[in-house]
Amino acid sequence: MAEKEATVYIVDVGKSMGEKRNGRSMTDLEWAMQYVWDCITATVATGRKTATIGVIGLKTDETSNELDDDPHFKHISVFTEIQQFLMPDIRRLGALVKPSETDKGDAISAIILAIQMIVTYCKKLKYKRKIVLVTNGQGWMSNEDLDQITKKIKEDNIDLVVLGTDFDDPEYGFKEEGKDPRKAENEALLRGLVEDCNGAFGTLEQAVSEMDIPRAKRVRTVATFKGFLQLGNPEEYDTALRIPVERYYRTYVAKPPSASSFVLRSDVGAEGEQGESSQLPKSPPEGGALTSVRNLRTYEVPDENAPGGKFDVEREELAKGYEYGRTAVHISETDENITTLETYAALELVGFIQTDKYDRYMHMSTTNIIIGQRGNDKASLALSSFIHALFELECYAVARLVVKENKPPVMVLLAPSIEPDYECLLEVQLPFAEDVRTYRFPPLDKVITVSGKVVTEHRNLPNKDLLDAMSEYVDSMELVDTDETGNPVEGLPIDDSFSPVLHRIDSAIRYRAIHPDDPVLPPSKNLTKLSQPPQDLVEKSKAYLQKLMEAADVKKVPPKVKGRKRIRESEKPLSGLDVDALLHQEKRARISPTNAIPEFKQTLTQAETIETIKDAVKQMTSIIEDQIKNSLGDANYDRVIEEMGVMREELISFEEPALYNDFLRQLKDKLLKEELGGDRRELWWLLRRSQLGLINQRESDQSDVTEEQAKEVSLRCHLSSRGIY
């Protein structure tokens, strides 16, 4: 179970916090709230009820706290009591955090109030307590009873963090020039208090700069298996080995938050929901005009005698079936129990394998660790002996794992892991024989002819110069750095490598929670730095890359020729032969309805004038209309859609969109007037679904149809008889 947390943020909202200083484009309050919002949204994103937050406003115009009778606590307001923070709380807090019209208010008194809030809320329970003060250090601060404050903070194990705008921090390397004497005095006062409490004192610039570094989420792992590591059957043999062990995740895939579906809330839907329960509130819930999408699943069975040809059945009346090919095979519960393998939870050793005989590609899962039962020294000692035996013999163990009774067994590999203060078994899943697929690929260093001859020099094989050039280029791109003494160090430490998807989505969600109307900021450089090689390596390897390009005879592909397709020079084959000339292909005059698409393309390819293209379109129009007119129901609809799609694509390529647009307008007019074999409005719905509308200016520069005009000539048609819209 996660630790309980209680954090109180004290935010200085004084008049001076609304000013811009030291060349910054934002006020001190906006700058400070970047850090506060980042901390609050990170806590809200966890969704934990045990992670609670309280917020106090310092130097507010009014006073609102339980100690407001004392003059020391004037101009201090409790914005939010300690509680679990949710989205509505973030919205309310955003409206409260504004610069005030005064600089009166004691930061030390605000810390005392925060201590009082934590003591009242946490009582004597086990909590992780924390107070964060963000201020610019202006105004008056009391230095009375600092010893008592320090004593109380230590007694209750409260972490005190003080961050100041433009506070001096020698460790970070920042010092404000020309500092106001009152601010310097307040800085010294706060620094002394924090040091006496063993807290953290720093400048806000460092805290804001570290926000770009993604935070790895630390989770408290839970045992996925508790049982025995055994060798032999203990029920039959007294010599069987049994060691109580526990299994935990070593690595686990972190997944970003999944998307949720929402729809606009309607008054009709709200009234309908209220009619179902008289206990629902009449006022709209938090979240405004959106409501979540709820799925409703119904099961229907065909029945000619039922209204609509179907009748509904309850889920309880259905029988479970499995797909075998395209056939649904029913299996009763009795028969299904027979297919269930009866197993019991255990980790049974079945064999051993030398480390050099095992291939790493056999891994089929993330890694787990096996340790001795917690609190059982005898089990830990026995498992340690087994681990050292595997290590000394350079062996891995193969075991059969059943994590829970009647669960399917899996085969796992157990590898010893010995560190100075920690020993365990690393466990990874192995494939069954049915999981292994064997594929044969041609060799990369030779070519075997049909007759069996082995060829080592071939146009598809790299020669020695190319191999040497590639080797030198790869060596020049080595991602290894050196320290001051010249010793190699890891150039890409795993702790500095972050998942762009995971942390980008997380930061975007948290930013959108605070700024619902602003565009999301670009991703952090810490996430994008690995998307391209380091610039110094690129410059270093430039000469080797040029040598590699010369050895491989790399040539730049000419840009795609723009212009009308019919006046372009036809692409020449590598052989240099004109296939059409060799076959003496004659120019086509008529397009056959049985082979319309290939012959239409061929006619356009051979076209030398616009009249030839118009004639081909006219023939295709006649063929399409004839197929629609003679279609029995929707028998020819798929063919018509395919032909229209080809016509549309080809006329875009030949930059003649007007021919297609004129054809489409005429076709729509005939269909709506039922001149092509009756009611064919369903075809329009299919054309709309296939996106075969007018060619607009975005698709072709030669078109005179705008996107708005294309939408006006809508393909949507009301099919009331079929219930399709």
Curated annotation (Swiss-Prot):
Source domain of life: Eukaryota
Compartments reported by the entry: Nucleus; Chromosome, Telomere
Pfam families from the UniProt entry: Ku, Ku_N, Ku_PK_bind
Catalyzed chemical reaction(s): ATP + H2O = ADP + phosphate + H(+)
GO cellular component: chromosome, telomeric region; Ku70:Ku80 complex
UniProt keyword list: ATP-binding, Chromosome, DNA damage, DNA recombination, DNA repair, DNA-binding, Helicase, Hydrolase, Nucleotide-binding, Nucleus, Telomere
Enzyme superclass (EC): hydrolase
Main location: nucleus
SMART domains listed in its UniProt record: Ku78
One record GO biological process: DNA recombination
Function: Single-stranded DNA-dependent ATP-dependent helicase. Involved in non-homologous end joining (NHEJ) DNA double strand break repair. DNA-binding is sequence-independent but has a high affinity to nicks in double-stranded DNA and to the ends of duplex DNA. Binds to naturally occurring chromosomal ends, and therefore provides chromosomal end protection. Required also for telomere recombination to repair telomeric ends in the absence of telomerase. ku70, of the ku70/ku80 heterodimer, binds to the stem loop of tlc1, the RNA component of telomerase. Involved in telomere maintenance.
Family label: Belongs to the ku80 family.
Subunit structure, as described in the record: Heterodimer of Ku70 and Ku80.
The protein's name in its UniProt record: ATP-dependent DNA helicase II subunit 2
Taxonomy of the source species: Eukaryota, Fungi, Dikarya, Ascomycota, Pezizomycotina
